[in-house]
Design a protein with these regions (language model features):
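Single conserved hydrophobic/aromatic residue that forms the stacking wall/gate
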Residues: 332-343
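Generic alpha-helical structural context detector
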Residues: 289-292, 306, 310
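Extended ligand-binding clefts on enzyme/binding-domain cores
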Residues: 277-295
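Extracellular/oxidizing-compartment recognition motifs
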Residues: 1-274, 283, 299-304, 308, ...
Length: 343
């Protein structure tokens, strides 16, 4: 148990702010991140860091262990699911590069790339497949350089958009193709402070196959030391065997389906890791069956059932999705009584 009392020190980190770049279509997940590196307390995790200006934490209401006593405050309860997977993941290729020569080994290993002063570099990075995880960007120098990191599942046909409705977007076509296509996606933004050994890692996980990286420098070159992902998802392990000799396409379909199931399961099941990250119980029923067909792990299924119970409103009706800040009920609660009344 961590003793988080008034002996702890704290400060308000002014370096971060939400980055609200408009995302076309129905996007209801969190915002991107804006980091002003000059305001970040670099080295705070090191024992030699000077924390003399940090303030003592104020003790709030004490935590109470569930089952140990009657208590009106917050109860400390065991986590119902195991920790998420955290696995290093390297990009496969630079598909487009503008304004800089790509050094041998870049992306595959930790290889530096220098962006000259007063220049602009654009890189389109390809992960090879869709993933969910935390993106890390390691860099040095480049004071006042602007770094924009955008994320997309796929690229779109290159014609102009006349609508913001996702169902009216141009077609994606072959997702392996990038030439002549348009990048649409949410983004993070960093303003470099000119220091050495900077590490920007997203606070929340992102979803991407493609990452669009743009760096605009000021009067100092910026050294991009590495860029990579850390895959994060619920630690499912596929425990089934499947064989269909002469039908390789079926094995490929199973591979794609299992990847989809994994990316749509983090701390909850979710309908879509890119646009919504919401646990709809109609979708969850299907995901739970996939889980029980392919694994011996029922923790997520039990967790979803419990969260469905927690979503029940005063009328005794479950919400259509939960956890969610927006109250929404399933149409089945309307259609079924209507059907019964018509009998």
């Amino acid at each position: 148990m961590v003793n988080t009392d008034a002996s702890w020190l704290c400060m308000k980190n002014e370096a971060y702010a939400p980055w609200h770049k408009p995302v076309l279509g129905y996007y209801v997940a969190g915002p991107g991140e804006f980091l002003s590196a000059s305001k970040y307390p670099w080295g705070w995790e090191q024992s030699a860091y000077d924390d003399s200006k940090w303030l003592p934490a104020h003790t709030g209401i004490e935590g109470g262990v569930k089952g140990s006593r009657d208590y009106p405050g917050r109860l400390l309860v065991p986590c119902p699911i195991p920790p998420m997977d955290l696995l290093s993941e390297r990009f496969e290729a630079v598909r487009i590069s503008e304004g800089v020569k790509i050094p041998v080994g870049f992306l595959k290993t930790k290889t530096s790339l220098t962006v000259p002063a007063n220049s602009k570099v654009h890189l389109l990075l390809d992960n090879g497949k869709l993933t969910t995880g935390y993106l890390s960007l390691l860099f040095s120098r480049g004071k006042n350089a602007e770094i924009t990191i955008a994320y997309a599942e796929a690229l779109y046909e290159g014609k102009e958009l006349g609508t913001t409705k996702s169902y009216s977007f141009p077609a994606k076509g072959n997702r392996d193709e990038v030439e002549g296509k348009r990048f649409i996606g949410y983004e993070d933004k960093v303003i470099a402070d000119g220091g050495e050994g900077r590490d920007f890692t997203t606070l929340w996980w992102r979803t991407w196959r493609y990452v669009d990286l743009t760096i605009s420098t000021a009067d100092e070159p910026l050294v991009l030391e590495d860029v990579y992902g850390t895959f994060s998802a619920y630690p499912f392990r596929c425990e089934i065997a499947f064989s269909a000799p002469g039908h390789d396409e079926l094995n490929k379909m199973l591979e794609i389906g299992w990847r989809t199931a994994r990316l749509c399961a983090n701390e909850t099941y979710m309908d879509c890791p890119y646009y919504e990250q919401l646990q709809y119980f109609g979708d969850t029923r299907i995901q739970a069956m996939i889980t029980l067909y392919n694994t011996h792990d029922a923790y997520m299924v039990k967790n979803a059932i419990e969260q469905g119970r927690q979503s029940v409103v005063a009328d005794g009706i479950t919400m259509s999705r939960y956890p969610s800040s927006l109250h929404q009920l399933s149409l089945i609660h309307i259609s079924e009584p209507t059907r019964l009344l018509s009998i």
